[in-house]
Amino acid sequence: MQIIEPTAWRAQPWRNGAGVTHELVRWPEGEPFAVRISVADITAPAPFSAFAGYRRWLYLLEGGPVTLAHAGRDVVLAQPADGLAFTGDAQIAATAVARPGRDLNFMVREALPARVQILRGGARAELAGAAIAVFAIAGEVAVVAGAGAGAGDDRRSLRRHGCAWCTDAQIAVELGADALAAALVIER
């Protein structure tokens, strides 16, 4: 299991040049990737970059509210973990940003079976997949890798905005009372 803390994020310009994103995971490395996890700074209204051939999930982490124009309607992301799922070639734009903030982006090649779960305080979730990411949005989040989630297993704590990434894994995610996390599971 790999833990990616915010200090290890790799900053890069958006594909369309309208902002900055911080890449956490690119799997496999290079182009074309199958999975990409990033955190984008949202500072002003701007169009989203197109990623044809991918499915995307976007969740507000902090700041906002942010209003997104999508499919002829406005979607307001006001609280942490408010989100939107869309295809990578959809025309999306942030049209209003009340306070600068950040969002979490999961991008997965369309051919891969994948799902995202928002996990809330006090929960325990058991997940298995070809690849799994757990992103700590808020509070205490622990990830336990291993089939038994017992004494010999690898238990890691995630700090705010930390991410656990593992491949071919079976994990348990344990959340403190006030915790909030997003989990991406690439099915086997």
Residue ranges and their predicted role:
Residues G53-A71, A128-G148, R160:
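Glycine- and acidic-residue-biased ligand/ion/polar-headgroup-sensing regions
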Residues P80-P113, T167-R188:
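Ligand-binding loop in jelly-roll beta-barrel domains
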Residues P28, D41-A44, G88, V108-E110:
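Non-catalytic surface loops within mature trypsin-like serine protease
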Residues R115-Q117:
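An N-terminal amphipathic alpha-helical segment
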